[in-house]
């Protein structure tokens, strides 16, 4: 009996220790909770939305007219014009990527107030929260704009339709059945995002030397270093107020264009003039325009801007650009 008892105890010890062996160990896989501990992971949601911007790569949508000519026999527009354009081949499909980016922006907006962006400085932490919130609204509005440009149109009911409006992160499959809003409702949604973004963003990024140089909306800041850390030179090329205003102007022009302004509503043209006029005033009016801006691609113009000199100058004609390349593929394909 004693042997049976000892055997039973040893067997029990083995069984219970084996249970521990079957328990999954920490395999270093990240969970969503990591965003609350490491702000760089939280910002990754926003950066992901940035990566889906159609302008991250060279596109020629704005110059693809009926008489466009190219030397590239595999050019997307040529393939579309010669019969390949279909549901299976659609180079103008922004539906998947832009909607995906909108959901990333929505998810980020849902957590941005819960993240500690700067543990050692509450004032700087609040400035980061402010800037990143503005960026998220701006990026969401930009993706809505591109969706409208490429996918809005007349529905089967004869109504001018826009896009499904997603202003929150979708938790389940049923939420994806949201119907398209009208074109007018969709445009209003874009403007709402841009207007909200402008509450948080300065017109331009860049270091300041004195509190007297603080832009409107930031006059409560008491330390120049705090402002420069968040809105200074290191933030250049991220979405700022000037870029938002430019997209508001583009949205207004799109809404006024014959493609979507089916009744030629003159008020829409006036609105487009107003939005773009404000941007020109911010640039200094006519004198702020580059007289050679239409030749921005020529070597003399690029050299004059000294883009690689580190002085933060740029071509006046260009508001927001991607990195500079030295290849000549564009010239080979189109000249």
Positions of predicted regions on the chain:
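Bacterial Sec-dependent N-terminal signal peptides
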Residues: 1-30
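Membrane-proximal, proline-rich intrinsically disordered regions
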Residues: 19-65, 69, 269, 292-300
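Elongated scaffold/linker segments in the mid-to-C-terminal portions of large proteins
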Residues: 37-41, 46, 50, 74, ...
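Conserved, well-structured interaction surfaces
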Residues: 44, 75-153, 171-188, 192-206
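Conserved alpha-helical segments that form or flank metal/cofactor-binding pockets of metalloenzymes
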Residues: 54-62, 142-157
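Short coil/turn linking the two alpha-helices of tandem helical-hairpin repeats
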Residues: 148-149, 155, 205, 254-263
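Acidic, serine/threonine/proline-rich low-complexity intrinsically disordered regions
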Residues: 184, 246, 255-274
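Charged, glycine/proline-rich intrinsically disordered loops and linkers
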Residues: 206-232
């Amino acid at each position: 009996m004693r042997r049976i008892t000892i055997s039973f105890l040893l067997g029990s010890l083995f069984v219970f220790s084996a249970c521990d062996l079957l328990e999954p160990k920490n395999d270093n896989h990240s969970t969503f909770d990591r965003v609350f501990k490491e702000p760089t992971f939280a910002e990754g949601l926003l950066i992901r939305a940035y990566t889906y911007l159609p302008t991250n790569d060279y596109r020629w949508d704005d110059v693809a007219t009926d008489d466009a000519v190219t030397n590239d026999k595999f050019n997307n527009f040529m393939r579309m014009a010669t019969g390949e354009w279909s549901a299976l081949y659609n180079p103008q499909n922004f539906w998947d990527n832009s909607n995906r980016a909108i959901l990333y922006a929505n998810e980020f907006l849902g957590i941005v107030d819960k993240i500690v962006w700067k543990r050692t400085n509450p004032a700087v932490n609040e400035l980061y929260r402010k800037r990143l919130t503005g960026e998220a609204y701006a990026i969401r509005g930009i993706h809505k704009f591109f969706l409208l440009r490429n996918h809005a149109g007349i529905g089967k009911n004869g109504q001018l339709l826009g896009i499904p409006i997603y202003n929150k992160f979708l938790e389940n499959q049923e939420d994806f059945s949201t119907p398209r809003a009208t074109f007018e409702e969709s445009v209003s949604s874009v403007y709402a995002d841009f207007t909200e973004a402008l509450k948080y963003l300065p017109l331009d990024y860049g270091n300041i030397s004195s509190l007297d140089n603080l832009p409107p909306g930031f006059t409560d800041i008491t330390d120049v270093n705090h402002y420069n850390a968040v809105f200074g030179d290191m933030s250049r090329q991220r979405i700022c107020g000037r870029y938002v205003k430019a997209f508001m102007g583009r949205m207004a022009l799109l809404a006024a264009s014959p493609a979507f302004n089916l009744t030629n509503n003159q008020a829409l043209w006036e609105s487009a003039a107003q939005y773009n006029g404000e941007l020109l005033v911010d640039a200094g009016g006519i004198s702020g325009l580059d007289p050679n801006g239409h030749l921005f691609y020529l070597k003399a113009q690029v050299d004059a801007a000294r883009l690689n000199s580190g002085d933060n100058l740029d071509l006046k004609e260009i508001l927001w650009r991607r990195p500079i390349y030295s290849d000549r593929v564009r010239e080979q394909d189109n000249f």
